[in-house]
UniProtKB/Swiss-Prot annotation:
Belongs to the UPF0173 family. Pfam families: Lactamase_B_2 (PF12706). One of its GO terms (molecular function) is hydrolase activity. The keyword Oxidoreductase does not apply. Keywords: Hydrolase. InterPro entries: Metallo-B-lactamas, RibonucZ/Hydroxyglut_hydro, UPF0173, UPF0173_UPF0282_UlaG_hydrolase. This is UPF0173 metal-dependent hydrolase lin1612.
Length: 228
């Protein structure tokens, strides 16, 4: 399995013949190396409804026929407002089997809304995501602050990789993310959600250096991937 990072919180997972895009904020994202019109994933997974995470989901899903996995409130919105048909609605605490493996949604402390035609629309609770693929557990925290139940996430799902936001202001910053890494006890921690906008400028290498002894961290450059 290969996991690659594409700026902000966009990651791509390739397992066998299946491609999964997570939070595909591509258009308007100067930090992203992808082109929306070239993406043909089998699945798109969304952590919440903010525009910098839903991103190009509708265009990509309509072009590719990808199944969109997200919380049920966001799923309803995408179906009714944007005409998406291949949607797998879920909610926090639930898990579901797909051809590629299992998806489980966890809590995240953040918001989830959009503005459409002058209306502010709530799109359900934000989530984190635990993927179980090829016997490996990958935790994608989404946008969140630090919370103590991250310990429970790590206990219930021994983690091989954890993607954690470090940008501060809208999510936890590097200091809290280092505590999150301690709580989760993942084998590898990868920072995300930083340097896309001035308000979330951070040094990811400094974050990795701040991790507790025994916790491995890695900064993925834009477009770079790892094999696990």
């Amino acid at each position: 399995m290969k996991i690659s990072f594409h700026g902000q919180s966009c990651i791509k997972i390739i397992t066998g013949n299946t491609t999964i895009l997570v939070d595909p904020f591509i258009s308007g994202n100067e930090k992203c190396d992808l082109k929306a019109e070239e993406q043909m994933p089998d699945f798109i997974v969304l952590s919440h409804g903010h525009d910098d995470h839903v991103g190009d989901t509708v265009e990509i899903a309509k072009n590719s026929g990808a199944t969109v996995i997200c919380n049920a409130d966001l799923a309803s919105f995408l179906a009714v407002e944007d005409g998406l048909e291949n949607i797998a609605p879920m909610h926090i605490g639930g898990k579901r089997q797909f051809d590629f493996g299992q998806v489980k949604l966890t809590q995240a402390f953040h918001g989830s809304q959009t503005v459409r035609d002058g209306r502010i629309i709530n799109l359900g609770f934000p989530t984190g995501i635990v993927f179980t693929i090829e016997g490996k557990n990958i935790y994608f925290a989404g946008d969140t602050g630090l919370f103590s139940d991250m310990k429970l996430i790590g206990e219930l799902n021994p983690l091989d990789v954890a993607f954690l936001p470090i940008g501060d202001n809208f999510t936890m910053g590097p200091e809290d993310a280092a505590i999150a890494a301690r709580f989760l006890q993942a084998k590898l921690v990868i920072p995300m959600h930083y340097n896309t906008f001035p308000l979330i400028e951070q040094d990811p290498h400094q974050f990795v250096a701040s991790l507790d002894e025994g916790i491995s961290g890695k900064v993925l450059e834009i477009g770079e991937g790892i094999e696990i």
